[in-house]
Amino acid sequence: MLEKFERYPLTFGPTPIERLGRLSAHLGGQVELYAKREDCNSGLAFGGNKLRKLEYIVPDAIASGADTLVSIGGVQSNHTRMVAAVAAKIGMKCRLVQEAWVPHEDAVYDRVGNIMLSRILGADVRLVDDGFDIGIRSSWQEAIDDVKAKGGRPYAIPAGASVHKFGGLGYVGFAEEVRAQERDLGFTFDYIVVCTVTGSTHAGMVVGFAKDGRERRVIGIDASATPAQTKAQVLDIARRTADLVGLGRDLSADDVVLNEDYAYPVYGVPSQETKDAIRLCARLEGMITDPVYEGKSMQGMIDLVRKGFFPAGSKVLYAHLGGAPALNGYGYTFRNG
């Protein structure tokens, strides 16, 4: 599906699939849980899911003649960290807008974790007080205009790389990669669980798994706490991506499965249940998830297993998208583990 698109390699190759045997047993042993370790996909600044997306965006950025990547996210954005790392790797400058998306108070929240790494990587980081929104932001446009005014040649990458024209391609590739790994494993996964916020990871999976009729087996766990906007954005990206890759069929709102039950209390703030899921996964599997994204999708998967959502005998693939560096911004929350 992706043969006609240029790709700039930023990852090691196919990410490993790991059986979560102890977690599966702890939850009753009726459902087999696995994790696809997107958090281990690259040596670039701790890696993560955004690199799959950026591999298809970088060729366009280079071809444009740009000298500066300009992007946006929250203070502890994984995406902006990855944009900063990619800019360093390809020899461009980087301008980042870090908005106040999370009502979280930690003494060093804006000095550790992802934002610290972005600064180390050489990005020009600007803090902005605007609150959370997955849409196009005026602060981002202002940064683009400022780079131009100072003689730079900006290349704009939206939050999460999601509404970029090529933003969904990387996770179409994820689905193709899973199919190849399933052939080696000798079975297919019944469900795929993924965290959903800006939408292109989920959207790309919907398109990629639609090729074999599993689009509704992609279970998005909302972490945005704005599910109506998020679902609409996933569907829009999925439709545009389907057209790009020539899927050959329309996608409907029913093809986007988004569970709204675990995003509380708000984006970026972990509930007690999210914190419990982070600890449980760490203590049973040694696998670290974060309070913003993967902790909430892990909470969702655990709860869905406990509620019997997945039929006995199901094989469930958890997409671990990365994000552990953000834990540094939650030092007080996890001060006792």
Swiss-Prot record:
EC primary class: hydrolase
Transmembrane helix found in the keyword field: no
Keyword Ribonucleoprotein: no
Listed EC numbers: 3.5.99.7
N6-(pyridoxal phosphate)lysine: modified positions: K50
Pfam families xrefs: PALP (PF00291)
Keywords, alphabetical: Hydrolase, Pyridoxal phosphate
Any one GO MF annotation of this record: 1-aminocyclopropane-1-carboxylate deaminase activity
Positions of the catalytic residues: S77 (nucleophile)
Domain of life of the organism encoding this protein: Bacteria
Reaction(s) the record says it catalyses: 1-aminocyclopropane-1-carboxylate + H2O = 2-oxobutanoate + NH4(+)
InterPro entries noted in UniProt: ACCD_DCysDesulf, ACP_carboxylate_deaminase, ACP_carboxylate_deaminase_bac, TrpB-like_PALP, TrpB-like_PALP_sf
Assembly description: Homotrimer.
Primary role: Catalyzes a cyclopropane ring-opening reaction, the irreversible conversion of 1-aminocyclopropane-1-carboxylate (ACC) to ammonia and alpha-ketobutyrate. Allows growth on ACC as a nitrogen source.
UniProt-recorded name of the protein: 1-aminocyclopropane-1-carboxylate deaminase
Lineage: Bacteria, Pseudomonadati, Pseudomonadota, Alphaproteobacteria, Hyphomicrobiales
